[in-house]
Swiss-Prot record:
It comes from Pseudomonas putida (strain GB-1). Has an important function as a repair enzyme for proteins that have been inactivated by oxidation. Catalyzes the reversible oxidation-reduction of methionine sulfoxide in proteins to methionine. This is Peptide methionine sulfoxide reductase MsrA. The gene is msrA. It is an enzyme of class 1 (oxidoreductase). Belongs to the MsrA Met sulfoxide reductase family.
Length: 222
């Protein structure tokens, strides 16, 4: 078994539930409204449109969140941590590698204006999903690629899009997709400081970058 001390050194190793930090019962304090969508409650309620939710992990959540809030049809975005063990972790705890969480963006979208399939196309094309426990220069389990699905339909579409994107990646000489695709776990929202970070700090770090490979047009629409 890998020891806790080894995980602190090698952050590519997932901790077990027993090794994970205990966390806390109290969630992080969040702003009431979205910083970019002025007047829009960060977590709802959302009264207009056919609202649905998507959860994506594609590396550092600062840059990922910005790309999704820029998409027409997206009505809110929140960054957080998911897929691990520690309840309500701090950013520092996630960075330690001892929570098991990856950084994610919760995307709230109007299905009448943008489809889940279109968001999946964005997800695949915005990052390199073949890198395992890293994304570019960002290394560790918190940067692993993930799609967490809120319905059986989302799970089916996510797996189909993965298979189609793998075919395109293979043609371009890339390796196997390592993206974790699963039913949605609990998303623990990140500290207020991280919410819409690049809107507050336009010159801030953004490590997001794709492979240049695209999904076939037939899989990018409704």
């Amino acid at each position: 078994m890998v020891l806790r001390s080894e995980i602190l050194v090698n952050k590519n190793v997932m901790p077990t539930a027993e090794q994970a930090l205990p966390g806390r019962e109290t969630p992080m304090s969040l702003p009431e409204f979205h910083y970019v969508f002025e007047g829009t409650p960060l977590l709802g309620p959302f009264f207009e449109g056919a609202i649905d939710f998507a959860i994506f992990g594609l590396g550092c959540f600062w840059g990922a969140e910005r790309r999704f809030w820029q998409r027409e049809g997206v009505v809110s975005t929140v960054v957080g941590y998911a897929g691990g063990f520690t309840p309500h972790p701090t950013y520092e705890e996630v960075c330690s590698g001892l929570t098991g969480h990856t950084e994610v963006v919760l995307v709230v979208f109007d299905k009448d204006k943008v489809s889940y399939r279109e968001l999946l196309a964005m997800f695949w094309e915005l990052h390199n999903p073949t890198q395992g426990m890293r994304q570019g220069n960002d290394v560790g389990t918190q940067y692993r690629s993930a799609i967490y699905c809120t319905s059986p339909e989302q799970l089916e579409q996510a797996e189909a899009s993965r298979d189609a994107f793998q075919a395109e990646l293979s043609k371009a000489g890339f390796g196997e997709i390592t993206t974790e695709i699963d039913q949605a776990p609990t998303v623990y929202f990140a500290e207020a400081y991280h919410q819409q970070y690049l809107a507050k700090n336009p010159q801030g770090y953004c490590g997001i970058g794709g492979t240049g490979v695209c999904l076939p047009p037939s899989l990018q629409g409704n």
